[in-house]
Amino acid sequence: MSKFWSPVVRALEPYVPGEQPQIDGLIKLNTNESPYPPSPKVLELMTHDAIDRLRLYPDPDSKKLKATIASYHNISPEQVFVGNGSDEVLGLLFMAFFQQGKAVLFPDITYSFYPVYCKLFNIDYRTVPLNDNFDIDFNDYPQDNSGIIFPNPNAPTAIGKPLAEIEALLQRNSETVVVVDEAYIDFGGQTAIALIGKYPNLLVVQTLSKSRALAGMRVGFAAGHKDLIAGLDRVKNSFNSYPLDRLAEAAAVVAFEDDSYFKRCCNKVIATRDYTVRELEKLGYQVLPSQANFVFAAPPAGNAAEIAQYLRDHKILVRYFNKPRINQFLRITIGTDEQMQKMIEVLQQY
């Protein structure tokens, strides 16, 4: 701690990401990355000409990527905002929309970056407990708020919400912004982007880190009414006028264009997830219903921390959260068939 730190910095409890260890032969199932490489067309971008152009600043408006995303989702480019990963997009929207004098609402068990943003930007917040089934119950969300944000599917529980329930929430909360954080939507959920033309207070955030395998490029975006997007642009341009580097933007464009590769990879992850759920349940694990590229599973003896260490000793890394209500669960990213078979074999020997 430095004497030069501001009171805000002194009070912060930064987000702690999953480990990125450099261990030979490690099966890494702890940060929900794709087990498959990006589209082969991404590699084709890495030409001498592309590298040479890195000496030039990128397009500050990311017009080509916005147009690509808009075309993919049948919306207008002015309804799209892009940023350096969805975490940056989320941070900017907290600043843009949630400093309204009332509490912003989000689940008590959810993405742990949300309270970090609130403390950083001095935003009042209130967490709403998940129900006994670890599901979000929108009936528990009061209308007196400065905004609502939740992941769909939720993280780390992996449980998704149907569009009908999201639309009902929007109808009850027409005076504040509702943010649907769709980092894992491509593994079985239905995106709410189709609703942005109907609800001017809806903002949908997605990332290319999971289903499109570009975690190392840091690309995220938001879709919403053009006035919400304009607000995000105002905040972004007060920090950094160049949101994406040239290679990241080009890679993101082709990741959307190669739709057949994207769908094949998603389908493989879903099939492997179904296999993993079946095998874990055979071992007596409680596995919450998943619409994500991971499962949230509780071992029968309730010894999740011990199992996490046991797997680590066998060079298999999963995520354990030492937090109330979920400290008997493991979050397990879906890897390749071979990786998940290996994990099951190791668990069978426990």
Curated annotation (Swiss-Prot):
SUPFAM superfamilies: PLP-dependent transferases. Pathway: Amino-acid biosynthesis; L-histidine biosynthesis; L-histidine from 5-phospho-alpha-D-ribose 1-diphosphate: step 7/9. The keyword Metal-binding does not apply. CDD domains: AAT_like. It catalyses: L-histidinol phosphate + 2-oxoglutarate = 3-(imidazol-4-yl)-2-oxopropyl phosphate + L-glutamate. Keywords: Amino-acid biosynthesis, Aminotransferase, Histidine biosynthesis, Pyridoxal phosphate, Transferase. It comes from the Bacteria. GO terms for molecular function: histidinol-phosphate transaminase activity; pyridoxal phosphate binding. Its EC number is 2.6.1.9. It is an enzyme of class 2 (transferase). The keyword ATP-binding does not apply. InterPro entries: Aminotrans_II_pyridoxalP_BS, Aminotransferase_I/II_large, HisP_aminotrans, HistidinolP_aminotransfase, PyrdxlP-dep_Trfase, PyrdxlP-dep_Trfase_major, PyrdxlP-dep_Trfase_small. Pfam families: Aminotran_1_2 (PF00155). Its cofactor is pyridoxal 5'-phosphate. The modification N6-(pyridoxal phosphate)lysine is found at K210. One of its GO terms (biological process) is L-histidine biosynthetic process. Homodimer. Belongs to the class-II pyridoxal-phosphate-dependent aminotransferase family. Histidinol-phosphate aminotransferase subfamily. PANTHER family: HISTIDINOL-PHOSPHATE AMINOTRANSFERASE (PTHR43643:SF3), HISTIDINOL-PHOSPHATE AMINOTRANSFERASE 2 (PTHR43643). This is Histidinol-phosphate aminotransferase. It comes from Cellvibrio japonicus (strain Ueda107). The lineage of its organism: Bacteria, Pseudomonadati, Pseudomonadota, Gammaproteobacteria, Cellvibrionales.
